[in-house]
Amino acid sequence: MSELWRRLGFLAFALLVYRIGTHIPIPGINPEQVAALFQQSQGTILEYFNLFSGGALERMSIFALSVVPYISAAIVMQLFSNSLPYLQELKKDGQAGRNKITQYTRYGTVVFALIQSTALTVTLQSAGLIESSSIFGAIVAVLSIVTGTVFLMWLGEQISERGIGNGISLIIATSIITGVPRAFGQALEQTQQGDLNYLILIVLGLLTLIVVALVVFVENAQRKITVNYAQRHQVRGMVQAPSSFLPLKLNMSGVIPAIFASTFLLFPATLSSWFGNIQGLGGLQEFALYLNPGQPLYILIFVILIVSFCYIWRALTFSSNDMAENLKRSGAYIPGIRPGEQTASFIDMILSRLTVFGAFYLSLVCILPLLLINSFGISFYLGGTSVLIVVVVMLDLQRQIQSYVMSQQYASILKNANISGSKKSRRR
């Protein structure tokens, strides 16, 4: 248990470092004008981006881009790893190949961070938010943001290695959680001013609890496929091996499609919002308004992206042919289904149905609360995507802690058994 507490302590320390970093501003930034800009951007995609950065974008800190460049690079690598022969071979090389792909993802993170930080710096300078308008001032700002992004990527990897849980996911969840008190404060302020009815606030609170319960239920639910094993020979005849099952999650893609879809929407919408302030590019500003959360175009694109990423993620991570081949090699079969192609077709049919359900479930959880909250004029900090990410990440953290505790208990039992066995042998 001491090892578990050490890992939890490292996790808490790393997240504390992250929160401190969100308050370190870019050199030469004008905080008053930045605060005024975000005061005017409430309810827009810019505020949504600020949610994923844990308020770092609003403060224009060195973590302003958060882990968005890393997620963008991870998306590109996932897509390329299934289409480029070189990356396909790396995936088959085991741990060495995965390390190489991780290295390429890091390089991609730096590239995306350079592009996004340059766009952000140019926009800040054109709006007069950076005190120095020189090239040197722009270079310092870009390097500060890129360095902060790379450090955040490294911090996430350290959490995964030395702490517990997925580091990048925990950073995103922490960013969202830190915005919850502010969201409640805004809602209470609206009720005190008479802009929001207390009954509506209670309904929204109940809706949030329902969404949390739905996410917990679906993420823990499984579709079990019964699997039998071939009869094995014994001295006194044939004995039927016990049957088992192949567990498949109802939401096979997890929270990945929602995160990827949000990232894809954040990037073009944010660039449109930034560059729309430049003279001659006013049309981009109008386009950015259509991509604000709750707008019909935003909802349409969001649902399309969620459905697309559900199918893409399933194609990248699940292979019905590989599952059927593994069952055949282990002497297992699905009752009533022939091993081989028929088993692969049956599993593929189940996977297709689960993918449809997962896409519908993710779209419902992400979009429906957003529509209701926006219709009441409340900040979308409590949107379905935010709740989904936080709940799924916390469930994953809980599972990893339980698995770690179980493994430590088994190790302790085996150690005690070896000690007692050695003592008995000495007595003899």
Identify the residue ranges that each predicted region occupies:
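N-terminal cationic and glycine-rich segments that engage phosphates or anionic surfaces
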Residues: 2-91, 96-428
